[in-house]
Amino acid sequence: MRTRMMALFALIAFCVMPIEAKKVKGNWDIITKEISVRDYSAIKVGSTAMGYSDSWFSLFSRGGNPSYVFGYTQGESASLRITIDENLYPYINVQVKNEELSISTENGTQLSPTRFKIEGTSKKLEKIQMSGCMDFVLRSALSGDDLEIIATRGSDVKMEKPVNVSNCIIEATSGSDIIINDLTTRIIRGRASGGSDLKLTGKAENGEYSASGGSDIKAYDLILNQLECSASGGSDIYTHVTDYIKASASGGSDVHYKGSARSDTSTSGGSDIIKEGN
């Protein structure tokens, strides 16, 4: 019985141990390849896209290198161009399935590129999911119906071109930032957690914000008609609402709002909700 129990514990320990991926370092011989792809409306890049737990490792090792970037342009047809070290290119796996473009590495190989840049084009873009090693930059104006943006594990999403969509969902977690400088939407839902930031400019009819775990939502320059928001765990929300705001703050958090909105507020745990000047 004792032998069987020891064998069982050994098996469990083996199953939960992290698996080391093969590691390949770039050779500084940078090449650019054009890749033929079907049209896509979603982008997913990062260690989670490769089927490995983020807690073990990133398959692209950032090291001391600059951020790796996915640059996107809305256009008439789908295209993809990858710039990377020549010896690493054979390990890159590009797939479009159910209109989702995913970029991973063959057999979970961990790559350490000298340079890694992706430029993509498609007719529409409805979902962006960046994790760990990759940042996303919008190169052109973007329009459509629905847009969902997810940034995790230190990835950044930067949209400095106009974005015009009906519904927008934004989520930044684990030290990630999302910046949208010119957003026009009917409904916006924004969530920041784990030391992440949202920085938003533009206008929306209705919104929901949630900030937790030392995160900030900086949106004085995104004007809403109505907003429901909550801040907790040392987080701050800055917003501008014209008609109605329902806000709660707890655990040393603050909500600052501008505008002439009617308010329904609640605070606890050394938190404040402050109406600022218009």
Enumerate the language-model features and the residues they cover.
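Intrinsically disordered, low-complexity terminal regions
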Residues: 2-278
